[in-house]
Amino acid sequence: MRAISKLFVFTVLVLGSLQYYCGRYGACPAQIAVISHYTWPCTYAPAVRDKLGKASEWYGANAAPHVSVASGWMQGKVMPHLTKVSQWTEKHVQPRMRQAGADAIVTARVAWNVVQQYQRRHVVPLTGRLLAKCPCLERWAEQAARGWQWLCKHARALATAVQQQYPAFVAHMGGIWEPLHGAYNRIYLDLGRPVQEKTSEDASAAPGGTQYITSTITMTMTSLDELVTVTAEDGLSDVVEASFKDLVADEFSAWQQAIERKADSVLQAFTEEVGEFEMQQHEAVAPKFRALLKHISAKSQEHYAKINQAIRDINSTMELDPATNQTIWFDAHGTQLHQYITRPLMREYFSQANDELANITNHIRAELREVVDSVNGQVDVIRQEHIEVYEEWADVMVSEWSRRMAYIDVVDRDLEAEAERNRNWKRFLKLKKRVIKVRDQLLEHPVKFNQLETFLKEIQSTLRILAQENGEYLYILRSKANLSFQEREKNDRLREQHEQEAREMTLREQLSTELAANGTEVIIDTFEVDLDQLLRSNSTSWSVPPADARAEPASGSPIQQAASEAAQQPSV
């Protein structure tokens, strides 16, 4: 593979050199002219143009519809996510990049000032001493300067030659570039995007109509002895002192800018981290509370269905099981009931519904309180972390800069600069107070959970609405159950009255028959006055099996027991 790569590179270089030679000088042997002709890209321009035209037609008939569908899918499915990513990048990444760029610029300035200071303090005096001890270095510097000038001269000549040959190369490449560019434009237009076309006249413009502006940078090196004179110690010290003052001013300005940027960004960083935490909490708790609301709704419907079925089973029919001689009950559709619906049983159903719904509601509210406490606790942790980081940063910055200013006071012995040093210390104290103030602001900075707070309020509002609706509907069902019980008790009393009248009629007929058989018809009128009392005294001997299997047989008829029970118990 390596040999093939070398062969390919060698072939390309040979062909390129051949094309350059034939285009530059024109006269070349016939065999070389043939090779140059068939290796020149413009030779194949007509064929390429014809093939690209056919390919464009095939593309418009076969590929363009699918490309349009893919483009629509791209716009509908992918672009919204790309927009979100772009917004997130613009909000979070770009500010950090700008901040990093600004910090890098400040760091570079400080480093450059330090390098300049080191160069003026150490390199320049050392160079002067070396030049004084070794005169040959001066001659070497002169030779290096002349070599550099020669190199710059030939580099400028080479650049000029390349610029002169470049228009001819562009003109030769225009023949092959034009069909490729036209086919690309047609494909690009099929995608529904704007295209800026380039005409052949523009592509094959005459070299003479193009103007080039060449800027040449010339560096003139003088010998180092002209820059540094060993005997000029006073002038050098003045330059060093001036540079030192500039360096101090630049460092103080950079430190002040760093303090101000940190003070402005610390609250923003805290707010952004809290916002990200809020988003994570909302995504974590939202499915949980939605599931709890669905659960309480499902439980409410279960209790409603159970109570409604019990209300429908209140009006039931009583029969006696011939096999077990026990009372059984049937609903309106003839289905046997598992148990007889009484007022205590109905009250138990209502109590179960109220208790379970209240427990679920209390559980949801406890979860809400737990979420609020957890969020507040985590916010305190985040705040404390930011405060600790800021305090550490502020302590390092303030202590290091105070040492730096103290060092400047020791090194700088200029009495005229005393006023400037006092102003710097005042500015330092002002910035230190600013740092402390920002720390207090970070400690008391309010936190707003707009999205999470809105969601929790919606959950609480939904709970209140569900509790109100459950209470109202259970009250309606309780009233409906009372009406059903009253209707059943009324029917039981009417049925008991009819049965009592039937028994009285039967007893009268029996007594009349017995007296008539004995020839004592006159006595009937005599006993008519005490007949009702006699029937009441003998009514117990005509009782039917009890309505409730749990009731005592000798306590009267089931209808009488139900009526007495209803009279003694409160409503549902």
From Swiss-Prot:
Feature: compositional bias, Low complexity: 560-572
Family stated for the protein in its record: Belongs to the SHE10 family.
Function field: Involved in spore wall assembly. May be a component of the mitochondrial RNase MRP (MtMRP), a ribonucleoprotein endoribonuclease involved in the cleaving RNA transcripts to generate primers for DNA replication in mitochondria.
Taxonomic source organism: Eremothecium gossypii (strain ATCC 10895 / CBS 109.51 / FGSC 9923 / NRRL Y-1056)
Biological process terms in GO annotation: sporulation resulting in formation of a cellular spore
Entry annotated with the keyword Lipoprotein: no
Coiled coil regions in record: 351-372, 485-510
Highest taxon in the source lineage: Eukaryota
The UniProt record lists the keyword Signal: yes
GO terms for cellular component: mitochondrion; ribonucleoprotein complex
Region entry Disordered, spans: 539-572
Main location: mitochondrion
Lineage: Eukaryota, Fungi, Dikarya, Ascomycota, Saccharomycotina
Signal peptide limits: 1-19
Subcellular location: Mitochondrion
Keyword set, alphabetical order: Coiled coil, Mitochondrion, Ribonucleoprotein, Signal, Sporulation
Summary of subunit composition and partner proteins: Component of the mitochondria-localized RNase mitochondrial RNA-processing (RNase MRP) composed of one single RNA encoded by the NME1 gene and at least 31 proteins. Absent in the nucleus-localized RNase MRP (NuMRP).
Name of this chain's protein: Outer spore wall assembly protein SHE10
